[in-house]
A protein has these predicted regions:
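Specific alpha-helical transmembrane segments that line the substrate/conduction pathway
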Residues: 31-42, 70, 74, 78-111, ...
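Transmembrane alpha-helices of multi-pass small-molecule transport proteins
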Residues: 25-72, 76, 99-103, 150-157, ...
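Hydrophobic transmembrane alpha-helices of multi-pass small-molecule transport proteins
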Residues: 44, 64, 70, 112-131, ...
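C-terminal-most transmembrane helix of multi-pass membrane proteins
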Residues: 1-4, 37, 127, 200-202, ...
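Helix-helix packing/entry segments at the starts of transmembrane helices
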Residues: 33-35, 89-95, 157-180, 212-248
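Membrane-interface interhelical linkers
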Residues: 1-8, 39-66, 106-117, 133-140, ...
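Specific transmembrane alpha-helical segments of multi-pass solute transporters/efflux pumps
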Residues: 12, 16-17, 45-93, 129, ...
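Loop-to-transmembrane alpha-helix entry segments
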Residues: 56-61, 90-93, 106-126, 137-141, ...
């Protein structure tokens, strides 16, 4: 159940790459993010606002840390999305499947096997291929990579905090921290204005309710049952959905080298997490067929 819910979350994130890219072309970036997380905060407050009192100071601090990491990741990702393509953004974002165990090693002394280092190498090669084929800009791709690092840290910290606190309350504080941070930036830049048009409002409602409030509530709930490494593995499916929706809805054309880079990144993801193949086989119901011998 947790795995299926996370797959649906990645599908929502994949399609919102296209919506967000269209929206921030006509509406200021940080104003968009402030309104998005205001909607997410309001949605969660309606169903669980009273639960925040159960967190105490440690829980409030934990939610704030998660919110700051999440906000940093989303802000950098959206800024990168303004400068590069939907497909590139989606595939580079998938690198957190290898960055998550790497940061786990540095912060929590989690052991890594040789396959993880090989996966990281493949992912870096794939990123280089993507950045060198005139798909968006290298600067935009680097912004997305920086956002991926923040998201990897957020996944690790959710693993530590999720078992300790109420899921709705912790997620609500996360969303509120993001809202306050983006509101301050939007005000400082003079970007805050009333959203207009269905392109902007549609993106705000979908990302606020489904891609933020519901998605991160599901993450906190699921990380009581699944490890950070497995969460990151499932989240890598976002790269597949982003590529598909970017191709179908946004007309992205990566070319053979760009798609080759995407394939190398995905190969790195699978190599870094050996259970990926088995997990994907279970998801699609695939079973190998043994050929009869002569």
């Amino acid at each position: 159940m947790a795995l299926l819910a996370l797959i649906l979350v990645t599908a929502v994130w994949g399609v919102t790459f296209v919506q967000v890219k269209d929206a921030v072309e006509i509406y200021p970036l940080f104003a968009f993010l402030a309104v998005r997380y205001a909607i997410a905060t309001g949605a969660l407050a309606l169903v669980g606002g009273r639960r925040v009192g159960t967190l105490g100071r440690p829980g409030l601090a934990a939610g704030t840390v998660l919110g700051l990491l999440l906000g940093l990741g989303i802000g950098l990702q959206t800024a990168g999305l303004e400068r590069t393509t939907v497909s590139s953004t989606g595939f580079i974002t998938g690198l957190y499947v290898v960055l998550t165990p790497l940061f786990g090693l540095v912060l929590f002394r989690t052991r890594l096997g040789l396959e993880v280092w090989l996966g990281v190498t493949l992912a870096v090669v794939g990123l280089a291929m993507l950045s060198g084929v005139h798909v968006g800009s290298p600067g935009g791709n680097l912004l997305v990579l920086a956002s991926t690092s923040a998201q990897a840290l957020q996944i690790l910290m959710v693993e530590r905090y999720a078992p300790r606190y109420d899921a709705i309350a912790l997620t609500l504080v996360q969303m509120a921290a993001c809202f306050v941070g983006f509101l301050v930036i939007a005000l400082a830049l003079g970007e805050l204005e009333v959203p207009r048009g269905w392109t902007v409002w549609g993106a705000l409602l979908v990302t606020g309710v489904f891609a933020s409030a519901l998605a991160y509530l599901i993450q906190v709930w699921a990380q009581r049952r699944l490890s950070a490494a497995r969460i990151a593995l499932v989240f890598s499916l976002e790269t597949v959905f982003a590529g598909l929706f970017g191709y179908w809805l946004s007309g992205d054309r990566l070319g053979w080298l760009g798609w080759g880079g995407c394939a190398v990144i995905l190969a790195g993801i699978v190599v870094a997490e050996p259970s990926a193949a088995a997990t994907l086989r279970r998801l699609v119901g695939w079973r190998p067929t043994l050929l009869p011998s002569d």
